[in-house]
Amino acid sequence: MGSKTCRSAEPLAGLPRDEPRPVYNRGMHNDPPPPSIELRLEPDQLALYWMPTASLPTGNTEPYSVALGWQTVAQAFGLRMPTPLSLENAIATVEDAVMPASRWLTKPPAGTAPPFTLHTRSPLLREVAEVAGVTLYTPPARLSRQAVENLFNRLSDQIHRPGATDTALPQRAEWAAALLILREALHHWGVEWVELG
């Protein structure tokens, strides 16, 4: 076979050099991201805040808060890993606290509409995500409701087998409390995942 020679690149016929290149995404919509809600889990409070966006300036709506935090639930556990009875009692308490937020979520500020994205930067919830296998430093870091349910089932299995310890789970009352609160919140709010910041 003979050798081939490369010719210098020539402009395409019909496209003058000084005119802009055609734009191929005309008519495509660059939709803004969905409205976001920040979940804050503190020692003595759970709170939800609408995060500011271009269509939702800061202070446009009242937050939702309830006097139930990870420390509140950990104290109900006796500041140790829960027993079957203390877990059942805590589930009822947490349900009573998170269920009213469903009404708050169905009344978004003017100019917003579902779907919403739930975000959190709460350290204990980040720890729950890490135990579930979420890589926090690779965006988007998302913890699914199913992953939370799987962790909760492991915790439940552990406490229903006296003397058994799941060594992959942190053996701290506050971690178990945060897991329980997140599990009940995602379930009762109908949220499939939470983004971790």
Model-derived features: positions:
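Conserved catalytic-loop position in the HRD/HxD motif
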Residues: 40
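Short beta-strand scaffold segments in enzyme catalytic cores
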Residues: 46-52, 57
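Beta-strand initiation motifs
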Residues: 56-64
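Helical "lid/coupling" subdomains associated with nucleotide-phosphate turnover
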Residues: 25-36, 65-197
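N-terminal polybasic/positive-inside topogenic patches
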Residues: 12-22
